[in-house]
């Protein structure tokens, strides 16, 4: 009689549902998963080592490229750690701008996650809907920094510049005539804050649109309910954070428990799940988008009423304005020194963590008193979630593997670093 044994195969790294360069060695008994061994490192770019070889003010851009879907949230963790070492506090207006863009980033991340998750499970329409809204938010990035993705907008001591009075506008093309473009630009005639206010007024109805396609959909529930369950106790033991931990029923959010920026000044709720399965992770992230929308509206209201500085006034850390440099030799010298040598950070160690869309993103910096870090260690938010793949997938079907991978929201830029 022929011997019956388990079958082992590779899932990825060239797989449309691998979310990057994920390689899994999967052991199956028929269609049932017995064991999963994740292999990482295929997107390793030595980010931490690169940060040790450049001045502090030249390494902020590396953070954008870690989790390249949550760009400004990564920057926030890094600049908070530098600010701790320097002993500086950004102006309150800069804190509100950071809070607003952290939440814009959260919505950007969750929209991409929702579209990709739905596409992996078989619902293509949602993917197209989500990218429609992402375009508007990408334009907010472009308005403040000139870049749609890698913004480098946050700086130690504040933000690069104040919010602009105009928005990027669409132009007539082969695909859109002047009449269509005029309608598309209706919300873009005012300032960035006017555009964001208009977006946040429309967005709750758009979330309802996504939910009408998925939340009560019979096939969606069959693919996600009871799949990849992690209990609250086990989620804590595995080091889960963010939506993955909250979906298991643990009310933990750094924005509430360890407030930073202006989170102690805004009102919002922390959504939590009960079952800890793929469906609860979906529901938690959907509600997080609603709460982010709520926070953004509060920030817009405050920023409209309270003009002011967005950067500390210290030429040892912040470059002087161009107009000042033209008439002040000392300011010109400071500018030259900052962009050739950077600034000296006092000797010491600092850890700063932010509630990034995927979980707790932490940056630990060791300074030896030079103009560049002695050591930088990044805590990737989704690393512990990937490490739990074996536990979440065991006993499920191969088709469920795809649903579980997409539900944990992984990006290999930050996992491999």
Curated annotation (Swiss-Prot):
Keyword Membrane among record annotations: yes
GO molecular function: NAD binding; NADH:ubiquinone reductase (non-electrogenic) activity; quinone binding
Catalytic activities: a quinone + NADH + 5 H(+)(in) = a quinol + NAD(+) + 4 H(+)(out)
Superkingdom of this protein's organism: Bacteria
Enzyme class label: translocase
Membrane-related topology note: Peripheral membrane protein
Pfam families according to UniProt: Complex1_49kDa
Keyword set, alphabetical order: Cell inner membrane, Cell membrane, Membrane, NAD, Quinone, Translocase, Transport, Ubiquinone
EC number: 7.1.1.-
Places the protein is found: Cell inner membrane
Presence of keyword Cell membrane: yes
An annotated GO cellular component: plasma membrane
Annotated HAMAP family: NDH1_NuoD
Subunit structure: NDH-1 is composed of 14 different subunits. Subunits NuoB, C, D, E, F, and G constitute the peripheral sector of the complex.
Family the entry assigns: Belongs to the complex I 49 kDa subunit family.
Entry function: NDH-1 shuttles electrons from NADH, via FMN and iron-sulfur (Fe-S) centers, to quinones in the respiratory chain. The immediate electron acceptor for the enzyme in this species is believed to be ubiquinone. Couples the redox reaction to proton translocation (for every two electrons transferred, four hydrogen ions are translocated across the cytoplasmic membrane), and thus conserves the redox energy in a proton gradient.
Name of the featured protein: NADH-quinone oxidoreductase subunit D
Organism expressing this protein natively: Coxiella burnetii (strain RSA 493 / Nine Mile phase I)
Gene: nuoD
